[in-house]
UniProtKB/Swiss-Prot annotation:
Belongs to the intradiol ring-cleavage dioxygenase family. It holds the Pfam family Dioxygenase_C. Keywords: Dioxygenase, Oxidoreductase. It comes from the Bacteria. One of its GO terms (molecular function) is ferric iron binding. Its EC number is 1.13.11.-. The keyword NADP does not apply. This is Putative dioxygenase RC0543. Signal peptide: none annotated. InterPro entries: Intradiol_dOase_C, Intradiol_dOase_core, Intradiol_RC_Dioxygenase.
Length: 208
């Protein structure tokens, strides 16, 4: 009887460790995304994740429409739900179309006179998979300014992250990265997508 119980416990233990191999994040730690700060944050953010227009307005912009999307993770690689994601960027003309939060900035980088509906800022909330997305446009690029967007992520259990997203070809991805509302995207539209998985310092309550 004792031998039978011993064999049963051995098999049960082996099954536990064999199953755990399918969940590598139990032991992994994700590399925390480094902070890169930007002085051109808007004084007031638009409350939608569509930067191409204000809510209830028609779109009229000059440039290529894109998706910016990805996942927010904690340092244990666990997806972070209900994180607030703030995005801001310049338009195709290289200027920010809003009033800046800070006063000591280069005023030439901003414009309030434009017939474009592009707002330059937006807010999203991550879903239960840690996913977020924004509809935006490719910003201006030159030898001095690279194509990029700025992002800040806030969650009550984690350290706030602010960084820059490099909108270069190496960060392009297919349209299966994240969940996007099909109402906002035409099925036949081949919209360029840029994906960024961002890791915040700290851990959430749940574990994988």
């Amino acid at each position: 009887m004792k031998k039978f119980i011993f064999c049963f416990l051995c098999l049960w233990t082996l099954n536990i460790f064999a199953a755990s191999k399918t969940y590598p994040n139990k032991l992994n730690r994700c590399k925390i995304t480094r902070n890169i700060f930007n002085d051109y944050e808007p004084k007031v953010f638009e409350t939608t994740n569509n930067l191409l227009r204000k809510t209830g307005r028609l779109s009229k912009f000059y440039g290529e429409r894109i998706l910016i999307k990805g996942k927010v993770l904690d340092q244990n690689c666990v997806p972070v739900a209900d994180a607030k994601v703030y995005l801001w960027q310049a338009g195709s003309g290289g200027k920010y179309p809003y009033e800046p939060l800070k006063t000591r900035v280069d005023k030439r980088r901003f414009t309030s006179k434009s017939d474009s509906s592009f707002t330059g800022s937006g807010i999203a909330t991550t879903n239960n998979k840690g996913e977020y997305y924004f509809i935006s446009m490719l910003p201006y690029t030159s030898s001095r300014y690279l194509r990029s967007a700025n992002i800040r992520i806030e969650h009550p259990s984690l350290t706030t992250l602010e960084t820059r997203l490099d909108l270069s070809d190496q960060n392009m991805c297919d349209n299966e990265c994240g969940e996007v509302n099909p109402i906002l995207i035409e099925p036949q539209e081949n919209m360029p997508s840029y994906c960024f998985d961002l890791v915040l310092q700290g851990t959430t309550l749940k574990r994988y």
